[in-house]
């Protein structure tokens, strides 16, 4: 049985989600809703500066385009309640506009003629289950209609924080993500639509301090760490490829080797383990949601006998998150009731 998916918002994550779904059996994109002309959407799907050219075929048709020979309907409705997802057989919507990222707003897709379930591709708030696949996906029971996949940084941070807490106990911590610039920043100095003075500055010419909700969101993924972490971002002049640095105080005394061994033992399809001296361009396009870098682990002994432990994990803030998103989508569809 094929699960048909709709995508609302065909931006960076929406387009990469369609690419990733081409590699998944039993899931296909049947309908895209975006206010942009289908010919432009098809062009941006086919050609991508950071992720490379689409390996399949894309052909513009009336009212949509063919992707690898299969028709994808394209509509341009502003309001979710006006999108007739059911006409395309869509069961699950990927809400990727960024504008309908709360439970109340996302539920507008569930109207008569709409979809059955929604997966938000952004943090969704306290009343929505936030899923980082292979960290806490088993919190889902199949009855949920709206869930969130969190953010790219949350998916980078969560498995690393989880491994630290399970093995050594986390008393508290602070994280910094050195994050590539995104479409929410200005390419040249100019007014920012959200009123952010720093994001109003030229993205490729500056280090831009910015907020990050990942440290707060970690409490939605790992409730035992709720309120124990703070964090922020430093946006830098790379188009994709980011790294999360986490500094923690642990309950146990540790060594660098003990930390690295715990991370190696926790590795899976979502959480990789690296011992090479890599840089950000080396992880573009990778499928790990988070890649722990054992070469960057540090343990600092303090005068009072305590320790500061620094760990780091790479992530492609575009494709790493998308890979995790689609893993969550597959699971969400599989357990649906």
Swiss-Prot record:
Is Endoplasmic reticulum a UniProt keyword of this protein?
A: no
List keywords of the entry alphabetically: Cytoplasm, Glycolysis, NAD, Nucleotide-binding, Oxidoreductase
Reactions catalysed = D-glyceraldehyde 3-phosphate + phosphate + NAD(+) = (2R)-3-phospho-glyceroyl phosphate + NADH + H(+)
The enzyme's main class, written as a single word, is oxidoreductase
Question: Can you name one GO molecular function term for this protein?
Answer: mannan binding
Q: Where is the active site?
A: 152 (nucleophile)
Q: What is its EC number?
A: 1.2.1.12
Site (Activates thiol group during catalysis) residue list: 179
* Gene Ontology CC: cell surface; cytoplasm
Q: Which GO terms describe its biological process?
A: glucose metabolic process; glycolytic process
- Annotated binding of D-glyceraldehyde 3-phosphate, by residue: 151-153, 182, 199, 212-213, 235
Superkingdom assignment: Bacteria
A single Pfam family it belongs to is Gp_dh_C
Q: Where does NAD(+) bind?
A: 12-13, 34, 78, 121, 317
Pathway this chain belongs to = Carbohydrate degradation; glycolysis; pyruvate from D-glyceraldehyde 3-phosphate: step 1/5
Primary subcellular site in the record, as a coarse category = cytoplasm
Name the job this protein performs: Catalyzes the oxidative phosphorylation of glyceraldehyde 3-phosphate (G3P) to 1,3-bisphosphoglycerate (BPG) using the cofactor NAD. The first reaction step involves the formation of a hemiacetal intermediate between G3P and a cysteine residue, and this hemiacetal intermediate is then oxidized to a thioester, with concomitant reduction of NAD to NADH. The reduced NADH is then exchanged with the second NAD, and the thioester is attacked by a nucleophilic inorganic phosphate to produce BPG.
Indicate the family of this protein: Belongs to the glyceraldehyde-3-phosphate dehydrogenase family.
Q: How does it assemble?
A: Homotetramer.
Indicate what this protein is called per its UniProt record. Answer: Glyceraldehyde-3-phosphate dehydrogenase
Q: Which organism is it from?
A: Lactococcus lactis subsp. lactis (strain IL1403) (Streptococcus lactis)
For this protein's source organism, the top of the classification is:
Bacteria, Bacillati, Bacillota, Bacilli, Lactobacillales
């Amino acid at each position: 049985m094929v699960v048909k998916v709709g995508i609302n918002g065909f931006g960076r994550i929406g387009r990469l989600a369609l690419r990733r779904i081409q590699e998944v059996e039993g899931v296909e994109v049947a309908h895209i809703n975006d206010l942009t002309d289908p010919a432009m959407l098809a062009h941006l799907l086919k050609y991508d500066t950071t992720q490379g050219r689409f390996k399949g075929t894309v052909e513009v048709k009336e009212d949509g385009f063919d992707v690898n020979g299969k028709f994808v309907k394209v509509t341009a409705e502003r309001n979710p309640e006006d999108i007739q997802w059911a006409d395309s057989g869509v069961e699950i919507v990927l809400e990727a506009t960024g504008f309908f990222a709360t439970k109340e707003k996302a539920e507008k897709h569930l109207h008569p003629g709409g979809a059955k379930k929604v997966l938000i591709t952004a943090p969704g708030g306290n009343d929505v289950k936030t899923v980082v696949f292979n960290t806490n996906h088993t919190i889902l029971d199949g009855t949920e209609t709206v869930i969130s996949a969190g953010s790219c940084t949350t998916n980078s941070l969560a498995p690393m924080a989880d491994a630290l807490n399970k093995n050594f106990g986390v008393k508290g911590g602070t994280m910094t993500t050195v994050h590539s610039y995104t479409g929410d920043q200005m390419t040249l100095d100019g007014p920012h639509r959200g009123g952010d003075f720093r994001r109003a500055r030229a993205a490729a010419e500056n280090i831009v301090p910015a907020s990050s909700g990942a440290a707060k969101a970690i409490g939605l993924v790992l409730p035992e760490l709720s309120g124990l972490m703070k964090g922020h971002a430093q946006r830098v002049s790379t188009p994709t490829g980011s790294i999360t640095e986490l500094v923690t105080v642990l309950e146990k005394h540790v060594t660098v080797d003990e930390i690295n061994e715990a991370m190696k033992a926790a590795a899976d399809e979502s959480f990789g383990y690296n011992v090479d001296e890599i840089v950000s361009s080396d992880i573009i396009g990778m499928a790990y949601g988070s890649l722990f870098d054992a070469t960057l682990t540090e343990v600092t002994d303090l005068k009072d006998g305590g320790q500061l432990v620094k760990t780091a994990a790479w992530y492609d803030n575009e494709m790493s998150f998308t890979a995790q998103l689609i893993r969550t989508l597959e699971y969400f569809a599989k357990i649906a009731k």
